[in-house]
């Protein structure tokens, strides 16, 4: 934060969207303008040893005039022990500032539907679906973590791409050789199988945070799929089937209300992936707000503001103009 940002004295609110690979802070003035944006690394306590330092570091940047904060944190509500640690970190940092704390996917669902019924499927480093009936009842599907879950996530797509690459390199897969050269190019690896083998292991051995690095490969798979690379398209179609299963399960759990679906997370910025899910679950509803907007909406209500439909529309434009629309 620039030094002058500490001098902000007009009423403001803030939101934090804490994901597996990155964490975003947005401070919003009462006139609807953005006072500040900050970003740091992931804050999921399940696999980020520095999660507390990163989270409290952002919270310490808040202006003294902050009226309320809305937080959506990856991993929240999934382990009583870690949940207590997250709550402790937030309460210690915020003191008397009112706040709301929930799971990052719950926050994204509120943002997407503005409190109306719907099922939000999130695919970023991890994956999960969150459904709301608009009357206070919620359900979740997935979100079990990378060891035995996160189907359809960027991490799983990246890992499956690496598995495919290794099978091509050692001869177990001969029908998908068209994947070798373009994928190696995106990773900065030689496409010659003998050279690529050692280069890939070198890449692997130097990773500082393997889960995030593997998840980052998903965007390359998406680009290749958009450019008619058949093996890459197959990887995304597999992910789409997994994510569609999340949506169907949520709808089954709430049979008495119609649940349109929407999306959040970097992986689902891929038109190819969204279209593949739509083929199984119907056309998605464009989210009213990006995930961080859900935290700002909650904070605005908690601060006693009046965030009506026009306020939400204005916020969506403001966040989009600031490059925060996804």
Give each language-model segment a name:
Residues 77-79, 107-109, 128-129, 268-271:
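Short, active-site-adjacent cap segments at secondary-structure transitions
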Residues 21, 74-77, 125-128:
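Short glycine-rich anion-binding loops that position phosphate/pyrophosphate groups of nucleotides
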Residues 71, 129, 263-265:
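A structural signal for short, well-ordered beta-strand segments
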Residues 39, 44, 60-101, 110-113, ...:
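Short beta-strand-loop/turn "lid" adjacent to the catalytic site in phosphate-handling enzymes
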Residues 99-107, 122-123, 284-293:
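Active-site nucleophile and cofactor-binding loops and adjacent substrate-binding regions
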Residues 116-169:
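Glycine-rich phosphate-binding loop of actin/hexokinase-like ATP-binding domains
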Residues 90-98, 137-145, 276-283:
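Glycine/charged-rich beta-loop-alpha catalytic/anionic-binding loops adjacent to active sites
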Residues 1-67, 112-119, 162-326:
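ATP-binding/phosphotransfer module of carbohydrate and carboxylate kinases, centering on a glycine-rich
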């Amino acid at each position: 934060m620039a030094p002058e940002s500490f001098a902000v004295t007009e009423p403001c609110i803030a939101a934090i969207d804490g994901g597996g690979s990155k964490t975003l802070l947005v401070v919003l003035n009462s006139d609807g303008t953005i006072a500040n944006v900050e970003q740091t690394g992931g804050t999921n306590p399940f696999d980020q040893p520095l999660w507390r330092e990163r989270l409290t570091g952002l919270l310490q940047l808040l202006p003294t005039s902050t009226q309320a904060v809305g937080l959506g944190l990856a991993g929240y509500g999934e382990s009583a022990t870690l949940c207590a640690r997250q709550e402790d970190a937030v309460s210690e940092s915020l003191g008397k500032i009112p706040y709301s704390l929930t799971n990052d996917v719950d926050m994204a669902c509120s943002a997407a539907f503005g409190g109306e019924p719907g099922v939000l499927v999130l695919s970023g480093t991890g994956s999960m679906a969150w459904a709301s009936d608009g009357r206070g009842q919620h359900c979740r599907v997935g979100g079990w973590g990378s060891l035995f879950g996160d189907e359809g996530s960027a991490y799983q797509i990246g890992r499956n791409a690496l598995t495919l690459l290794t099978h091509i390199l050692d001869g177990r897969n001969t029908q998908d050789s068209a994947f070798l050269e373009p994928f190696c190019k995106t990773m900065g690896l030689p496409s010659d199988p003998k050279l690529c083998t050692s280069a890939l292991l070198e890449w692997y051995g130097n990773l500082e945070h393997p889960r995030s690095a593997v998840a980052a490969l998903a965007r390359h798979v998406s680009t290749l799929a958009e450019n008619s690379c058949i093996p890459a398209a197959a990887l995304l179609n597999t992910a789409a089937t997994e994510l569609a299963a999340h949506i169907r399960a949520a709808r089954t759990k709430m049979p008495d209300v119609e649940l349109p679906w929407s999306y959040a997370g970097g992986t689902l910025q891929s038109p190819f992936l969204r279209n593949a899910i739509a083929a199984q679950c119907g056309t998605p509803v464009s989210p009213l707000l990006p995930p961080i907007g859900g935290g700002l909406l909650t904070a605005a209500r908690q601060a006693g503001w009046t965030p009506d439909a026009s306020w939400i529309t204005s916020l969506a434009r403001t966040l989009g103009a600031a490059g925060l629309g996804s």
